[in-house]
């Protein structure tokens, strides 16, 4: 979308210089949690005003430059447990320190301050945030990836990308419900 968080253009927070903040939301999928695991999907959502978009990279598409391209123009990126998982994983696998590129807020800690503990899906249920794939979890995401890789199962890839997209875009809903600026 042209004019929507344009690459290379930094946006000020709402009310500063009359520009609308460009919010970013990041979530990854991996083959597991160990240091030997691989990135399988990187999703970045962009929300500016009424415009919403989710870009995703998977498999060999995932490079430091490609992730930087998805983050370009975003004022602040939000994650859930990203400080401990997503961002260190990206740094280890791609050599990219996202926190040096864009301001980061981990919504998990905002949830904790409101006594909302547990993983993203647990918090979503407690806050009434809906999902199209309510029974999906991280274990199933790993299985879907291997079904795609080993069997060229395009339906498995489609479901995996939809699961990641829901994670990404529900971060926006979560941020708004928490009232985090």
PLM regions with names:
Residues 1-20:
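N-terminal accessory regions of nucleic-acid-interacting proteins
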Residues 21-31, 164:
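Two-metal-ion RNase H-like nuclease active-site motif
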Residues 27-29, 86, 106, 167:
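Acidic active-site catalytic centers that drive phospho-/nucleotidyl reactions
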Residues 33-34, 86-89, 172:
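Short catalytic/ligand-binding loop motif for oxyanion handling, primarily in non-cytosolic enzymes
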Residues 35-38, 116:
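Short glycine/proline-enriched turns and hinge-like loops at secondary-structure junctions
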Residues 37-49:
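Short conserved beta-strand segments at catalytic cores or DNA/RNA-binding microdomains
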Residues 52-127:
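Conserved DEDDh/DEDDy metal-dependent 3′-5′ exonuclease domain
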Residues 128-181:
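Acidic, Mg2+-coordinating catalytic module of metal-dependent nucleases/exonucleases
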């Amino acid at each position: 979308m042209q004019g929507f968080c344009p690459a290379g253009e930094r946006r000020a927070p709402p009310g500063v210089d009359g520009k609308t903040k460009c919010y970013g939301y990041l979530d990854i999928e991996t083959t597991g949690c160990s240091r030997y695991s691989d990135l399988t999907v990187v999703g970045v959502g962009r929300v500016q005003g009424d415009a919403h978009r989710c870009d995703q990279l998977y498999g060999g598409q995932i490079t430091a430059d490609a992730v930087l391209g998805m983050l370009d123009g975003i004022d602040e990126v939000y994650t859930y447990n990203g400080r401990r998982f997503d961002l260190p994983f990206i740094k280890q696998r791609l050599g990219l320190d996202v926190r040096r590129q864009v301001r980061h807020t981990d919504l998990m800690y905002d949830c904790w301050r409101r006594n909302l503990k547990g993983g993203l899906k647990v918090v979503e249920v407690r806050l009434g945030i809906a999902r199209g794939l309510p029974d999906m979890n991280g274990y199933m995401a790993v299985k879907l990836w291997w079904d795609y890789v080993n069997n060229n199962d395009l339906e498995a890839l489609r479901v995996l990308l939809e699961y990641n997209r829901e994670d990404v875009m529900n971060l926006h809903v979560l941020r708004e419900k928490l009232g985090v600026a």
